[in-house]
């Protein structure tokens, strides 16, 4: 991911790479949810109901994400990624273009979903607790969803985990393909 992060791409493909980067920075947000965001709240967070599960997520928007968001600031939506096209067309083009940005393996099989998978994998490699990773991804507790009603999860744990993951990827030298 480090190599992919530091890759320059043609301007026509930049929005697809930036959508992928935003997904990673926003804890693996799915493309349908990313394209439906409306605003960043005054507390510096985005709140959204995950399309797949309906669960409410709260994500702190880190400065690196703000930089990308500002490039694509929309009128009716937070991002203008789909304001001139349909979501399905953007999703299809994103899937096509991501595979061509770096032609050698494993990048030539890259999908948008890799951002979510990589966020979780990097988190686990950094010994971030499984419960924090699951909460960051919007998964229900592995223990008991009824218990979750009584326990308020401390979002600061996920915020700190996300910052640690971002720093791990962005502040180290990119790896070369072998």
Where are these regions (language model features)?
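Catalytic-site neighborhood detector that most strongly recognizes the C-terminal catalytic loop/helix
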Residues: 50-54, 137-167
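Short, basic (Lys/Arg/His-rich) helix/loop patches that form interaction surfaces
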Residues: 5-13, 92-139, 143
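Conserved tyrosine-mediated DNA breakage-rejoining catalytic core shared by Y-recombinases
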Residues: 35-70
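Basic, Lys/Arg- and aromatic-enriched nucleic-acid-binding interface segment
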Residues: 1-31, 35
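Active-site/catalytic core of tyrosine-dependent DNA strand-transfer enzymes
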Residues: 1-2, 62-107
